[in-house]
Amino acid sequence: MSNTQKQLALAKAAKKSVNTADTEEKNRALFAMADSLEAAAADILAANRQDLEAAAGNIPESMTDRLLLDGKRICAMADGIRAVAALPDPVGEILETSTLPNGLEIVKKRVAMGVIGIIYESRPNVTSDAAALALKSGSAVVLRSGKDAFQSARAIVAALKTGLAQTRIDPDALQLIEDTGRESSYEMMRAKDYLDLLIPRGGAGLIRAVVENAVVPVIETGTGIVHIYIDKDADWDKALRIVYNAKTSRPSVCNSMEVLLVHEDIAADFLPKLERLLVRNRIEAGLPPVRFRLDPQAARHIGGEAAGADDFDTEFLDYILAVKTVASVEEAVGHIEAHGTHHSDGIVTENRHAADYFTTHIDSAAVYVNASTRFTDGGEFGLGCEMGISTQKLHARGPMGLKELTSYKYIVQGTGQVRE
């Protein structure tokens, strides 16, 4: 048995301590985990410095921001755990009841998933978010961090397990796979005897590898090739504010806009205003400017590089924006359906017909009208922190909170009935 299999077995053996814990016990564990995380801040920051030093020069500046921890972010992680404790416990919820003509009483009841595996990349906060959500939803959790964030993840998990040790929940219900080699990921993908669910969080390569190779049930958290379409009937003040926020507030996250579509009737006047906002104003403020990848029509109005063959199919996760002009809302929808990832897409318009057409025909997990796509987030949706953004349709779609991490079973109460 490999070390990874041993850790999977430990999580499976410990799952009953979580599956059977009542709400009070789980919340007590979460508060202890949050307190322990804050108490270990110095150790976590020291570990994070190791990760940052190892990554220096090897990852883009925008990705460094995802990896970076500071005292404020650690406090936010701890507060995120406490916020999960404050959420209603979904386990045990009665979803449906019915009584059959033969007198059988059937109850559909929400139950814990069992053991959840998470494979993720360079975001240390995923470690605490995933642990909190899994444990509150009644499941043990096995985490597999990417190499970039491994030292940070190890220090965070050590702190969380210290908190768990003060409660009735077995600390072995939280595992961080120690082997950061590729084989450990494939072992998790094949671990159907240990894992009830596997969730990948990261770039397109990781997600594709898990979806194509896993024999464990998977929820796909797709990449975010996020579009915003500026209609000819858009309010320009709204449009500029929304585009600025969607692209620059945190470009390294999956709900950040990657592609801007602009109606050709307004492109000549709108795009220069956008260029001023995203490029010149940011340079004057000492901020990184947005770099444009332009189709031929957009290039007539603003400066930037010519869009390459793959630029409208790329999740840049950087201060890069692909820009294309379109002749209609129908063309915008066609482009999004051809190039999007069904994550989050939006329209800016004052035309109700255009908005209705867009929301009806765009088949994404979150579809926006006159708002930034950066709101696709469990916390912003009132779900607490999230396990990821599901872009598939089965079981879960959009931000995955506590309910999306549970299953259900039927409890059938009889008085001696037999089937004829």
Swiss-Prot record:
Lineage top rank: taxon: Bacteria
Pathway: Amino-acid biosynthesis; L-proline biosynthesis; L-glutamate 5-semialdehyde from L-glutamate: step 2/2
Catalysed reactions, as listed in the record: L-glutamate 5-semialdehyde + phosphate + NADP(+) = L-glutamyl 5-phosphate + NADPH + H(+)
Location in the cell: Cytoplasm
Top-level EC class: oxidoreductase
Coiled coil spans: none
Main localization of the protein described in the UniProt heading: cytoplasm
GO CC annotations, alphabetized: cytoplasm
Keywords: Amino-acid biosynthesis, Cytoplasm, NADP, Oxidoreductase, Proline biosynthesis
Family affiliation: Belongs to the gamma-glutamyl phosphate reductase family.
Annotated function: Catalyzes the NADPH-dependent reduction of L-glutamate 5-phosphate into L-glutamate 5-semialdehyde and phosphate. The product spontaneously undergoes cyclization to form 1-pyrroline-5-carboxylate.
Protein name, per record: Gamma-glutamyl phosphate reductase
Organism of this sequence: Neisseria meningitidis serogroup A / serotype 4A (strain DSM 15465 / Z2491)
